[in-house]
Swiss-Prot record:
Homodimer. This is Glutamyl-tRNA reductase. It comes from the Bacteria. During catalysis, the active site Cys acts as a nucleophile attacking the alpha-carbonyl group of tRNA-bound glutamate with the formation of a thioester intermediate between enzyme and glutamate, and the concomitant release of tRNA(Glu). The thioester intermediate is finally reduced by direct hydride transfer from NADPH, to form the product GSA. The keyword NADP applies. PANTHER family: GLUTAMYL-TRNA REDUCTASE. Belongs to the glutamyl-tRNA reductase family. The lineage of its organism: Bacteria, Pseudomonadati, Bacteroidota, Cytophagia, Cytophagales. GO terms for molecular function: glutamyl-tRNA reductase activity; NADP binding. It is an enzyme of class 1 (oxidoreductase).
Length: 425
């Protein structure tokens, strides 16, 4: 009997940030939790995906272990009474629902930013961690590779991944365009609001820029983020020295008056161009700065227009994306149904092989080596032809949803319940 595929999901859709932060898991914690679940349940296949927007556990079992898994998650994160917050979790106990959900997550349909490009790699990491612990079996291997192939189709056949659909992504995308002809470009990020932090992380995840510097009035958080992203941190007191070195300045400073005034910028030695991307409201870069030679400023409206256009393209592509997903799920379900009859097919092959070997053993001593070899080949060929039709009929019955009756008939005819699934030598 093939176990049901299920999922427990805590995401931005139902759970506030403070809850998501508490249950978020790193690689070591994901692996530790998978081993806990394996020890306390009968599940054979497990996958845990944890990002800033979701923590999800996928598992195979005919039992509903959602309560147990939530409790084990609480133990892993040292959260007392996590089960009391079960209303924040979505439970997918039907295989069709869990499979569809993982497809939508892996493709980016369920992301807070539709078409999120990071999620594919995050899913790949989760799959790798599962495989590292031998907790990815035939079902999960096939499912994950089907999702990865589906993602390639979505990229090739739709506009779902085109452009940057968030302000932070659009900022990184624009930066790449502006600095494409500038070798070893220097980028300075000023301010650490929510957008500034997202920009830092997106630079780390999606670009090859090496010379990125961060500065902020309050150094504690910015030093930690700089360490997380592997970028340089400089004191805010040295701001203008850093600005002088930068080819691009990205500002998300919360300030009533512009931090970067025309007068201060005018003091800089501008040899060619210096770009400012101003993500602040009110603006932190003086609107008059563009009057200066070599100074080019992009404000939040420009960035927002880029992200809005990309988001509109992605939303328009969703019907096509859903069709591609459904095509893949149909194909996966056909394979999954065939998996249900695989044990019966193996047992039938084993039963026939036993009969063949027993009969051969009665006569082989009377034959020469050459004769024995020929008889062995002939009987193997006969067996393969005998078994071909039942196998084809079983697979056809799978597609019609009628395999159970045929399985029962074969079990009775050949006493398959007593046969092992593996063919013995």
């Amino acid at each position: 009997m093939i176990s049901n595929f299920k999922s427990i999901s805590l995401t931005y859709r139902k759970a506030p940030l403070e809850i998501r932060e508490r249950v978020a898991l790193n690689e070591a914690e994901c692996k530790s939790l998978m081993l806990r679940i394996k020890d306390f349940t009968d599940t054979a296949e497990l996958l845990i995906l944890s990002t800033c927007n979701r923590t999800e556990i996928y598992y195979t079992s005919n039992e509903d272990y959602s309560n147990d898994i939530i409790k084990l998650l609480g133990v892993e994160k040292n959260i007392t009474g996590l089960i009391q917050q079960k209303e924040y979790f979505e439970i997918y106990n039907e295989q069709a629902d869990a499979v569809l959900h993982l497809f939508e997550v892996g493709i980016g349909l369920d992301s807070q930013v539709v078409g999120d490009m990071q999620i594919v790699n995050q899913v790949k990491y989760a799959y790798q961690w599962s495989a590292d612990l031998n907790l990815a079996g035939p079902f999960l291997h096939r499912l994950m590779h089907t999702i990865f192939f589906t993602n390639k189709r979505v990229v090739q056949e739709t506009a779902f991944r085109d452009g940057a659909a968030s302000v932070s992504y659009a900022t990184v995308e624009l930066s790449e365009e502006l600095l494409s002809a500038t070798p070893n470009a220097n980028i300075l990020i000023v301010g650490l609001g929510e957008i500034g932090a997202d920009v830092c992380r997106n630079f780390k995840a999606n670009t090859s820029f090496k010379n990125i510097t961060l500065t902020n009035r309050s150094p504690l958080k910015s030093e930690a983020l700089a360490a997380e992203c592997g970028i340089e941190h400089v004191p805010f007191e040295t701001l203008w020295e850093a600005v002088a070195k930068a080819d691009l300045v990205i500002s998300s400073v919360a300030k009533e008056e512009p931090l970067f005034t025309k007068e201060e910028i005018q003091k800089l030695s501008i040899l060619s161009h210096k770009y400012f991307i101003d993500l602040s409201v009110p603006r932190s870069v003086d609107a008059r700065a563009e009057e200066l030679p070599g100074i080019i400023v992009y404000d939040i409206d420009h960035i927002q227009n880029r992200s809005n256009e990309a988001l509109e393209n992605r939303l328009n592509a969703i019907p096509h994306v859903r069709k591609i997903i459904l095509d893949s799920i149909v194909e996966f379900n056909e394979w999954s149904k065939e998996m249900e009859v695989s044990p019966t097919i193996n047992k039938l092959k084993n039963a026939l092989e036993q009969i063949r070997k027993e009969e051969l053993s009665r006569f082989v001593k009377q034959l020469s080596d050459e004769e024995a070899k020929k008889v062995d080949e002939i009987t193997k060929s006969i067996m393969q032809k005998i078994i071909k039709l039942p196998v084809l009929q079983l697979k056809a019955a799978c597609k019609r949803g009628e395999a159970e009756t045929l399985i029962d008939v074969l079990n009775d005819l050949f006493n398959l319940d007593k046969q092992p699934e593996q063919i013995r030598d």
